[in-house]
């Protein structure tokens, strides 16, 4: 049993309002204020996914990074798919946390809106690990607008190609 005293979850994390985050999309974790909590210091695994092979799209940051760290601490091998060179720092940091968990992983950069990129992710995973056990379709894209009428066709296509089409 864990004898650590629990902290009130309402006071455990930063409370809004947060400062403006002047970043282009995709954002970089190290430039966020406050820094997000991906479970780096808190999640304790129990080996529930020992030797499972997991692909996580968008696994370099945000929810994808938290999932990657948790699955690695559960014993899984992690394949992180992420989109742009600008995300290399976040992806490398996530891989470092995977390795600190005693697991291993690979990074695959490329846009999953491109079907050939999706095939490349599968091929590299099979080549390295021989199988795929878990797929986490986490990568997503969305911009906010005051009205749906403001969304042009290019924006609509980018959103659906990332969030829906890439999964198939």
Task: Give the residues covered by each predicted segment.
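Conserved Rossmann-like nucleotide-binding pocket used by diverse enzymes
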Residues: 55, 79, 106-108, 135, ...
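Helix N-cap/beta-alpha junction loops of NAD(P)-dependent oxidoreductase domains
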Residues: 41, 142-147
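Conserved glycine-rich Rossmann-like NAD(P)H-binding loop of the short-chain dehydrogenase/reductase
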Residues: 76-93
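Non-catalytic terminal and boundary segments that flank Rossmann-like NAD(P)-dependent oxidoreductase
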Residues: 1-50
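Catalytic Tyr-X3-Lys loop
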Residues: 133, 141, 149-168
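Canonical Rossmann dinucleotide-binding motif of NAD(H)/NADP(H)-dependent dehydrogenases/reductases
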Residues: 46-80
């Amino acid at each position: 049993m864990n004898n650590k005293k629990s902290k009130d979850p309402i006071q455990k994390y930063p409370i809004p309002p947060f400062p403006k985050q002047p970043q282009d999309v995709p954002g970089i974790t190290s430039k966020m204020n406050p820094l997000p909590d991906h479970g780096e210091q808190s999640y304790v695994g129990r080996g529930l996914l020992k030797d499972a092979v997991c692909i996580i799209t968008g696994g370099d940051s945000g929810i994808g990074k938290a999932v990657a760290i948790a699955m690695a601490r559960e014993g899984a091998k992690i394949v992180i798919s992420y989109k742009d060179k600008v995300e290399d720092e976040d992806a490398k940091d996530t891989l470092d946390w995977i390795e600190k968990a005693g697991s291993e992983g690979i990074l695959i950069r490329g846009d999953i809106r491109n079907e050939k990129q999706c095939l490349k992710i599968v091929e590299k995973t099979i080549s390295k690990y021989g199988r795929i056990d878990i797929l986490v379709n986490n990568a997503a894209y969305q911009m906010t607008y005051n009205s749906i009428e403001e969304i042009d066709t290019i924006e609509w296509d980018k959103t659906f190609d990332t969030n829906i089409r890439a999964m198939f």
